[in-house]
Regions:
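Long, intrinsically disordered, low-complexity accessory segments associated with secretion
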Residues: 1-178
C-alpha cells in the first residue's frame, strides 16, 4: 500500500440472507418520505450466527444480468448472535405520503382531540405494507381509526397500511390527549 492509502477489507464473506423488507413512515423522523429497511436474523441459517461488531453494512442485490448492484448502506450496533438486525437502506421513491392534521378540538382545559389523515400512494408494481409510526404525549387514546392500531409503548403507536399497486390508501384516526 502507498503512503496515506486506505483499503477496505470485508470482515465477513458474502452472506446469502433471508431478509424481510420493511417500509416505514414516521412523521417525526421524515415528514414526507417512506424509509426502506431490511431485517434479518443473525443466525447460522443466514450464514452468520456470530457476534457482529458495530460498523457499516453495505447491501447489494443481484441485477437482472446477475451482477451485483449496490442498494444502500447503514451503520449497525454490536449485535449478539441470534438477534435481529435492521439495516435502513434509504427512502422509497415510488411510495408517496402526505400527512395532515384535519381538525383540532379542545374538549376541556386538560383534554384535546386531533383528527389526523395519512395518504399513501403506491406506485410500485407489487402490494406493500407500510408501517405508519405515530407518537404522542401524556395520557392518550386513539378513539377512532380506519385501520387497526397497535400500541408499541407509552409514547408510540403504529398502523399497518396495505397498499396495492397504483392505489391510494387513506388512514384516518382521532386521538384524545389528556
Amino acid at each position: 500500500m502507498l503512503d496515506n492509502q486506505t483499503k477496505q477489507v470485508s470482515l465477513f464473506p458474502d452472506a446469502n440472507l433471508q431478509t424481510k423488507r420493511i417500509y416505514e413512515y414516521d412523521y417525526s423522523k421524515n415528514s414526507d418520505k417512506v424509509s426502506v429497511s431490511l431485517e434479518f436474523q443473525n443466525s447460522e441459517v443466514n450464514d452468520l450466527g456470530m457476534p457482529l461488531p458495530a460498523g457499516r453494512v453495505r447491501v447489494f442485490q443481484n441485477d437482472t444480468d446477475g451482477s451485483q448492484e449496490f442498494i444502500g448502506e447503514d451503520n449497525i450496533d454490536h449485535t449478539p448472535r441470534d438477534e435481529k438486525v435492521r439495516v435502513t437502506i434509504g427512502n422509497a421513491f415510488d411510495i408517496a405520503v402526505e400527512r395532515a392534521q384535519m381538525d383540532y378540538r379542545r374538549i376541556t382545559d386538560r383534554v384535546s382531540e386531533q383528527d389526523i389523515q395519512v395518504k399513501l400512494r403506491n406506485h410500485k408494481k407489487e402490494t406493500v405494507t407500510v408501517v405508519v409510526v405515530e407518537h404522542s404525549w401524556g395520557d392518550w387514546e386513539v378513539t377512532k381509526s380506519s385501520l387497526p392500531v397497535r400500541k408499541v409503548n407509552a409514547r408510540q403507536f403504529e398502523f399497518d397500511a396495505q397498499c396495492n399497486p397504483d392505489q391510494e390508501v387513506v388512514l384516518t384516526y382521532t386521538i384524545r390527549n389528556k
